[in-house]
């Protein structure tokens, strides 16, 4: 069977990315940050504070992971050859996201990756506090990324 030129250039319909998990992660991180940023937080028992900060760290990690996965999925839709994205490091992925206008700068994302890595293997209150301090910046950057992806998916 011979294909016509129209059939060769037809592409499958592209459905919008399902961004529900990223939206949920952003909301969970925002909720956790609201709690640990509240005036009442300092009056809470130390055990509760440690547990709540650990929750912020967990939400930071899951939000970061979802961000780079959604960034990769969006880039797979945009680059001429999606197989180009099979091997690049996370740094190259964020650079491509910057070049494509999905993120305004790469440096914050490199910092978020470092923060995510410091809690991956060992845990300490100091490390948790450091990650929690960076969570506000991640929340803002992740919201901007979500907005950029939504605009390209007509959501």
What are these model-derived regions, one by one?
Residues 1-155:
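Solvent-exposed interaction patches of small proteins and small membrane subunits
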């Amino acid at each position: 069977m011979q294909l016509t030129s129209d059939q060769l250039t037809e592409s499958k319909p592209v459905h919008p990315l399902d961004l529900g998990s990223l939206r949920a992660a952003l909301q969970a991180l925002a909720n956790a940050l609201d709690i640990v940023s509240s005036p009442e937080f300092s009056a809470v028992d130390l055990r509760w504070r440690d547990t709540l900060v650990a929750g912020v760290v967990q939400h930071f990690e899951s939000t970061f992971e979802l961000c780079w996965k959604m960034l990769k999925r969006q880039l797979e839709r945009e680059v001429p050859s999606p197989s180009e994205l099979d091997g690049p490091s996370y740094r190259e992925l964020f650079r491509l996201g910057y070049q494509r206008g999905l993120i305004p700068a790469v440096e914050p994302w490199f910092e978020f990756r470092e923060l995510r890595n410091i809690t991956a293997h060992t845990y300490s209150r100091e490390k948790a506090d450091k990650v929690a301090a960076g969570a506000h910046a991640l929340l803002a950057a992740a919201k901007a990324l979500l907005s950029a992806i939504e605009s390209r998916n007509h959501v």
